[in-house]
Amino acid sequence: MLRKATKDDKKVLEGLGEFIESLELDILNEVSKEIFYDILTYIFESEEDRFSHKYCTVYEKNGEILGFLFSYHYDNLDEMKDFWFNNARSKFGLSDNSIIFDYDEMLEGEYYLDTLYVFSESREKGVGNKLLEDFTKSSYPLLSLNVAQSNYRARKLYESFNFKKECEVFIGHENYDHMVIRK
């Protein structure tokens, strides 16, 4: 079943942390793994960050979270940036350049799927499809996401939901295709 996440859904942090670690982002060189997970917990429990429980949808079966996604509208971006740069970063003593991801991954007016993650033991069971289907049912007229150019499998999934490549962006250390659905 799909539902909005709560602050108590700490399993999301395991998947989010694993995903971010796989991207080898610069912030991982700045803080210990323990501090990194403290940061993730802090921002997940917040109401303002892009990785807040408020922007998270989970897919759950028999009380276990099998996957999740984070999505939000462009109009929330200033609040998210403000929270990171003026709150989270100072709380953890991070440098002025410290970020998890840059904030230029989306374009004005978009409802953006930031992260879709399915736990390894639940892959190939339709969990990603259910999460993506829920996202595409949004009433927003412009939906977007980014997919690594090397991730052919994910691209195929997104194309099956009628996402089309709009442009290219550079995130972390890799090139991504910015894909959209215009309703």
Regions found by a protein language model. Name each.
Residues M1-L16, D26-E30:
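A short beta-loop-alpha structural element at the N-terminal edge
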Residues S22-F44, R89-G93:
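Conserved GNAT-fold acetyl-CoA-binding loop/helix
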Residues E34-C56, K61:
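Active-site rim helix/loop that mediates acceptor-substrate recognition in acyltransferases
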Residues V58, E64-H73, Y112, Y117:
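Conserved beta-strand in the GNAT
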Residues H73-Y111, T115:
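Conserved acyl-donor/pantetheine-binding loop and adjacent beta-alpha core of acyl/acetyltransferases
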Residues G109-Y111, L132, S138-Q149:
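Conserved GNAT acetyl-CoA-binding A-motif
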Residues S122, G126-D134:
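Conserved acetyl-CoA pyrophosphate-binding loop and the N-cap/start of the following alpha-helix
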Residues P141-R155, F161, C167-K183:
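C-terminal "cap" of GNAT-fold acetyltransferases
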